Amino acid sequence: MKKVSWEKREKKKVAIERIDTLFTLAEKVVKYSPDLARRYVELALEIQKKSKVKLPRKWKRRYCKRCHAFLVPGFNARVRLRTDRMPHVVITCLECGHIMRYPYLREVKEKRKRKKD
């Protein structure tokens, strides 16, 4: 029983390391080979699906969900901050036009708390 859970843990650990390595490689090569970076992202996502591991937050927002391009602000992505009603970050993929929105309300609340103190 314990051996099985240990093996699962080890497999997940290896999967996370591989995913991290692939995203790091994608980050390095995206400037001169966007297609290779896209392939690295696709491989990382396949590993993530097969091993049923959560993608680390730092990488989750760095690729386009539609075309799997590795996003670099100013190169193939546009990043804007919006404060209408609910503050959020808008990331636009310049390769396929896909728009992703991420709220940053938690950060705003922390900033207000610090101002009051």
Swiss-Prot record:
<dbReference type="GO" id="GO:0008270">
    <property type="term" value="F:zinc ion binding"/>
</dbReference>
<dbReference type="InterPro" id="IPR007175">
    <property type="entry name" value="Rpr2/Snm1/Rpp21"/>
</dbReference>
<dbReference type="GO" id="GO:0030677">
    <property type="term" value="C:ribonuclease P complex"/>
</dbReference>
<feature type="binding site">
    <location>
        <position position="67"/>
    </location>
    <ligand>
        <name>Zn(2+)</name>
    </ligand>
</feature>
<feature type="binding site">
    <location>
        <position position="93"/>
    </location>
    <ligand>
        <name>Zn(2+)</name>
    </ligand>
</feature>
<comment type="similarity">
    <text>Belongs to the eukaryotic/archaeal RNase P protein component 4 family.</text>
</comment>
<dbReference type="GO" id="GO:0005737">
    <property type="term" value="C:cytoplasm"/>
</dbReference>
<keyword id="KW-0540">Nuclease</keyword>
<keyword id="KW-0819">tRNA processing</keyword>
<feature type="binding site">
    <location>
        <position position="64"/>
    </location>
    <ligand>
        <name>Zn(2+)</name>
    </ligand>
</feature>
<dbReference type="GO" id="GO:0004526">
    <property type="term" value="F:ribonuclease P activity"/>
</dbReference>
<keyword id="KW-0862">Zinc</keyword>
<comment type="subunit">
    <text>Consists of a catalytic RNA component and at least 4-5 protein subunits.</text>
</comment>
<keyword id="KW-0255">Endonuclease</keyword>
<protein>
    <recommendedName>
        <fullName>Ribonuclease P protein component 4</fullName>
        <ecNumber>3.1.26.5</ecNumber>
    </recommendedName>
</protein>
<dbReference type="InterPro" id="IPR016432">
    <property type="entry name" value="RNP4"/>
</dbReference>
<keyword id="KW-0479">Metal-binding</keyword>
<comment type="function">
    <text>Part of ribonuclease P, a protein complex that generates mature tRNA molecules by cleaving their 5'-ends.</text>
</comment>
<keyword id="KW-0963">Cytoplasm</keyword>
<dbReference type="Pfam" id="PF04032">
    <property type="entry name" value="Rpr2"/>
</dbReference>
<dbReference type="GO" id="GO:0001682">
    <property type="term" value="P:tRNA 5'-leader removal"/>
</dbReference>
<feature type="binding site">
    <location>
        <position position="96"/>
    </location>
    <ligand>
        <name>Zn(2+)</name>
    </ligand>
</feature>
<keyword id="KW-0378">Hydrolase</keyword>
